[in-house]
Amino acid sequence: MATVAMINKAKATPKYATRRYNRCGVCGRPRGYMRRFQLCRLCFRKLASEGQIPGVTKSSW
């Protein structure tokens, strides 16, 4: 879990725009980020399996 200080640091506007990075909106995780949902892969999987993300279905082949 990300610390509060790291989440606040990511929210602040940096001196240069290229230094900005994405974090999960739920847990603050910086890796495995899915831009379309603004979630990390772990939170996305949990919320999708609970049916809380509309339009997302489990696929099998």
Curated annotation (Swiss-Prot):
Keywords: Metal-binding, Ribonucleoprotein, Ribosomal protein, RNA-binding, rRNA-binding, Zinc. GO terms for biological process: translation. Transmembrane segments: none annotated. Zn(2+) binds at residues 24, 27, 40, 43. Binds 1 zinc ion per subunit. GO terms for cellular component: cytoplasm; small ribosomal subunit. One of its GO terms (molecular function) is structural constituent of ribosome. Its cofactor is Zn(2+). Pfam families: Ribosomal_S14. It comes from the Bacteria. Belongs to the universal ribosomal protein uS14 family. Zinc-binding uS14 subfamily. Part of the 30S ribosomal subunit. Contacts proteins S3 and S10. Binds 16S rRNA, required for the assembly of 30S particles and may also be responsible for determining the conformation of the 16S rRNA at the A site. This is Small ribosomal subunit protein uS14. It comes from Treponema pallidum (strain Nichols). The lineage of its organism: Bacteria, Pseudomonadati, Spirochaetota, Spirochaetia, Spirochaetales.
